[in-house]
Amino acid sequence: MRFACHSIPGAVVHHIQFEKLDYGESNALDKFYNSDVAIIDLSVQVQQNQLFYLLGLRENFGMKQNILLYYDTDKEATQQTKLTCANNSFVSYLLSPDNYLVTTNPAIDDTMRTSLVSKLKHLLEMNEVQSKVELY
């Protein structure tokens, strides 16, 4: 993720641990709510409710440029999560046998996969990131 973010000229990348957001640390929440684009990994099931809550608050502040990631271990669960995230860019991914992170499509059994870095770079370029990108 960092590689994709650093490939965007002028992007500033911050990685914020979930625990800081969950605890309500003001500096972490300020960065989260004020970032131009938030990249949020929803792969950890027990973190999803809090992340969706924080994402909803972020959207209420008018910050609608969000990229949601999900590690695809179960096509059905991935598809259900994707449907929940319909208003955001959703990218499911997995680790290929060659040890590369690649995107998946939960709706079909796809064999043509894009690298996760390429997909993130494309989405960031579409969002015309000028200042800050946050990783969660």
Q: Can you say where each PLM-predicted feature lies in the sequence?
A:
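Amphipathic coiled-coil/heptad-repeat helices and related helical stalk/stem segments
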Residues: G24-E25, L51
